Amino acid sequence: MLILVVGLNHRTAPVEVREKLSFSAKSLQGALAQLKSYPVIEGCAILSTCNRTEIYAATLEMDDGLNAIWDFLSRWSGVGISEIKNFTYSHTLYDTIRHLFRVAAGLDSMILGETQILGQVREAYQRAIEYESTNRVLNTLFQQAITVGKRVRTETGIDRNAVSISYAAVELARQHLGSLDGRSVLVIGAGKMSELTARHLVANGVSSVIVSNRSFERAVALAEQFRGRAVRFDELYRCMEAADIVISCTAASHCVVKAEEVSRVMDKRRGRAIFMVDIAVPRDIEAEVGNLAGVTLFDIDDLKNVIDQNLAERKQAAVKAEEIIEEELDGFMKWLGMQFVVPTISALKKWGDEIKQKELCRALNRLGNISEHDRKVICSMANSIVNQILHVPVAQLKSYALTTEGHLYTEILQNLFNLDVPGQKPKKQPAPAGIKEPVLAKKG
């Protein structure tokens, strides 16, 4: 059994191509059924996110399996096969397994070590199970990938440090304020970055969200997402008097938070400290605000320094993660290799047993009336001869099963002995140039 993947991601294809080759949750059942209908596909699963689409398949024929996946993608999306090949990558067997393990660990993501992808891998597997498109090999592969993803995060901490602007702001707030439970935040601006930062703050315990924006309607829309309160822009200093945290990210071309006004706010706060983060470019908060007593101010450059440091730590963790993946990959390959050779070994032993039984029957019939003792001696000798003849090829095949050449030697053995292995088709090797194919005489 061979495992393949054909995919595209943010590195290989622009968004206008990725969106054509994406699969919604509603379309997944039909897509898996269509892909599974190809005779060469024994099992399949589809991983589709905003940054990647990957088709995983189990097949008996590598080239035919790849062609089936490309044909499926073309028919499903309406994009030509040649164009799809320009934007996709493909891996087989060993490289497929390593690739999925790296994906689940967050090592192949746009943001190194991000956590969302592990849940997406789990979801892809669960949908394949639900829609009955997978098989035993893919089941074990995805289960192991999920285990690898968990192990990497537990043992390396690759996902512990913030590498986005919005989350870095939250991390700094937590470092300076301790627990964020019950804290209040004033968000100045109602754009995407303000929304992301507010969302992270609420997820980390902030209980009160106030949004101030020049467009009051947009402030209301953002505040409603967090059961917060919207205030008009001329009320922001009054609201600042009670806030623990201020996040500012407007599109203004000049500073909207003045040091003189914040100084008055701090007088009214009577020594109670305030934490402020200016995410805007150009800056929203005058730099002099950071010099005021009781004010801790960070700007976008401070956040980027935090992110750079955290990225360096994640890259260091990624080195350990790769070691874990190689260790897990070795274990999975041993399991997979044995799954492939065990049916062949059984077929070989069956082949030997059939010959033994046929020849024993012939010999015993010729010998006629012999004692039970002699019969047992002859049967024991026949068993011993067959077992000794098969011992070396069986032992060698088991040892090759643990290498990348396992499939090759298994196929050679199947061809040499013309073994009928359920679910595996021995490939008929063409005769070398200049040599005629042998003509086998018909029996009888």
From Swiss-Prot:
Pathway: Porphyrin-containing compound metabolism; protoporphyrin-IX biosynthesis; 5-aminolevulinate from L-glutamyl-tRNA(Glu): step 1/2
Positions of NADP(+) binding: 189-194
UniProt-annotated stretches for the region Disordered: 425-444
PANTHER family: GLUTAMYL-TRNA REDUCTASE
Additional notes on this entry: During catalysis, the active site Cys acts as a nucleophile attacking the alpha-carbonyl group of tRNA-bound glutamate with the formation of a thioester intermediate between enzyme and glutamate, and the concomitant release of tRNA(Glu). The thioester intermediate is finally reduced by direct hydride transfer from NADPH, to form the product GSA.
Functional description taken from the UniProt entry: Catalyzes the NADPH-dependent reduction of glutamyl-tRNA(Glu) to glutamate 1-semialdehyde (GSA).
Quaternary context: Homodimer.
Listed name of the protein: Glutamyl-tRNA reductase
